[in-house]
Amino acid sequence: MKKAIIIGSGIAGLAAALRLKKKGYQVSVFEKNDYAGGKLHAIELGGYRFDLGPSLFTLPHLIDELHQLFPDVEIDFNYIKKKTACHYFWEDGTSFEAPADLENFAVKAAEIFDEKQNTLSKYLQNSKMKYESTKSLFLEKSLHKSNTYFSKQTLKAILKIPFLGINNTLDQENKKFSNPKLNQLFNRYATYNGSSPYLTPGIMSMIPYLELGLGTYYPQGGMHRISQSLFELAQKVGVEFRFRKNVKKINHSNNKVTGVTTEKGTHDADIVLCNMDVFPTYRQLLQDIKAPEKTLKQERSSSALIFYWGIKKSFPQLDLHNILFSENYKAEFEAIFNNKSLYEDPTVYINITSKQSPQDAPKGCENWFVMINTPGDYGQNWENLVIKAKKNILSKIKRCLNIDVEELIDVEYVLTPQGIEKNTSSYRGALYGAASNNKFAAFLRHPNFNKTIGNLYHVGGSVHPGGGIPLCLLSAKITADLIPNTNA
């Protein structure tokens, strides 16, 4: 049986392990941590459970697909569709519970923001068109294989690109709204790939369709259940996991991969698939080949500063997903991307899974995942920044929600960009690999295969098609499609 080694058990590594197992490979996953899941991990603290990483669940069929690869194996994984996508708040008292469907969103947003319903409906239909026109090219195939460009579907997508807002920024696309709050709301979707709405291309206005058209979901048991269900499935179908095994080198001979070396020895393989960020992959594991410097020098995506707070009270006005908007969105992104600093009036995201899973917090309490977008780690004094950010966040909550939660904080855990990099090997703590702050970004990501070493492949948020749970899962699917079955 042919052997495949996977470096890293993030969501893309887990998905790739299952797909290669289905193709007949003997699969071993080497993971430096003592748990599977990468950023999709969780902690328990003083009776509160917190998902550490991604908090938004869309395109659940991509997880279902993986479970359906092995129909005879039963794994407990369920999810519900949310009626409300997100609850938005501004300092002037404006709030908007965004319905998670296109028609209701247009009706309610028109009422709240005094916008023409027709303008909203057209925008959302345009978002749908952009997604459906380009997903086959940008999300489901390798952009780095010539045969991708010869299908009728791909040629249709390419012909539509000039009409998809590629020459505008997302902010320019969103200027069609008369209310600046609505412009700000739709600009927020740039953060879904760690970019700035004032730089990322207008084609990114397809992202709202994923959330508002295809739906926002919640996995029962929390986001951690996504990675754990795949880990359990992989174990049951015979994937081997080697935890606390730090790969030191990817071995190759005559331009073909031969295996990996850990601290304790060499392991041979016919295929190696790396779920590690491409920057440390080249700098640490592939030091003996010429690295693609142009790719590695791309601007990194934003990172995050996250406070995990156990709150000794419940707040019925809040939902699973909540956003408290900055009064100056442009200045916030300039601070993050230009100055590599934190803005004094940050946009604050609060995720509360105890709204859906009451067992995640003691009775009458809530588990708050409180996040602000930040630059990556460029040597800033994070100890000082954490102190300042906490003060600014508490002040923002007070101004937007008229509540003082400082005295209600029961337990606290903090994760900085430094911590994210340490836990996940994401260079500078970037959440999505490279930023998408130019119109060619989709074509500049590292391919899913290595151009120098045969049978070496790459998956995860730092390669095509990008970061976030759905795109990481698609990277595994694209990559698996490039690898032949063992009987081929």
UniProtKB/Swiss-Prot annotation:
<feature type="binding site">
    <location>
        <position position="431"/>
    </location>
    <ligand>
        <name>FAD</name>
    </ligand>
</feature>
<feature type="binding site">
    <location>
        <position position="461"/>
    </location>
    <ligand>
        <name>FAD</name>
    </ligand>
</feature>
<feature type="binding site">
    <location>
        <position position="275"/>
    </location>
    <ligand>
        <name>FAD</name>
    </ligand>
</feature>
<dbReference type="GO" id="GO:0016491">
    <property type="term" value="F:oxidoreductase activity"/>
</dbReference>
<dbReference type="GO" id="GO:0000166">
    <property type="term" value="F:nucleotide binding"/>
</dbReference>
<feature type="binding site">
    <location>
        <begin position="468"/>
        <end position="469"/>
    </location>
    <ligand>
        <name>FAD</name>
    </ligand>
</feature>
<dbReference type="Pfam" id="PF01593">
    <property type="entry name" value="Amino_oxidase"/>
</dbReference>
<feature type="binding site">
    <location>
        <begin position="55"/>
        <end position="56"/>
    </location>
    <ligand>
        <name>FAD</name>
    </ligand>
</feature>
<dbReference type="InterPro" id="IPR002937">
    <property type="entry name" value="Amino_oxidase"/>
</dbReference>
<dbReference type="InterPro" id="IPR014105">
    <property type="entry name" value="Carotenoid/retinoid_OxRdtase"/>
</dbReference>
<keyword id="KW-0274">FAD</keyword>
<comment type="subunit">
    <text>Monomer.</text>
</comment>
<dbReference type="InterPro" id="IPR036188">
    <property type="entry name" value="FAD/NAD-bd_sf"/>
</dbReference>
<keyword id="KW-0125">Carotenoid biosynthesis</keyword>
<keyword id="KW-0285">Flavoprotein</keyword>
<comment type="function">
    <text>Can also 1-hydroxy-all-trans-1,2-dihydro-neurosporene, 1,1'-dihydroxy-1,1',2,2'-tetrahydroneurosporene and 1,1'-dihydroxy-1,1',2,2'-tetrahydrolycopene. Probably involved in the synthesis of myxol, a gamma-carotene derivative. May use FAD as a proton acceptor.</text>
</comment>
<keyword id="KW-0547">Nucleotide-binding</keyword>
<feature type="binding site">
    <location>
        <position position="31"/>
    </location>
    <ligand>
        <name>FAD</name>
    </ligand>
</feature>
<keyword id="KW-0560">Oxidoreductase</keyword>
<feature type="binding site">
    <location>
        <position position="247"/>
    </location>
    <ligand>
        <name>FAD</name>
    </ligand>
</feature>
<comment type="pathway">
    <text>Carotenoid biosynthesis.</text>
</comment>
<comment type="similarity">
    <text>Belongs to the carotenoid/retinoid oxidoreductase family.</text>
</comment>
<dbReference type="GO" id="GO:0016117">
    <property type="term" value="P:carotenoid biosynthetic process"/>
</dbReference>
<protein>
    <recommendedName>
        <fullName>1-hydroxycarotenoid 3,4-desaturase</fullName>
        <ecNumber>1.3.99.27</ecNumber>
    </recommendedName>
</protein>
<dbReference type="InterPro" id="IPR054840">
    <property type="entry name" value="hydcarot_desat_CrtD"/>
</dbReference>
<feature type="binding site">
    <location>
        <position position="39"/>
    </location>
    <ligand>
        <name>FAD</name>
    </ligand>
</feature>
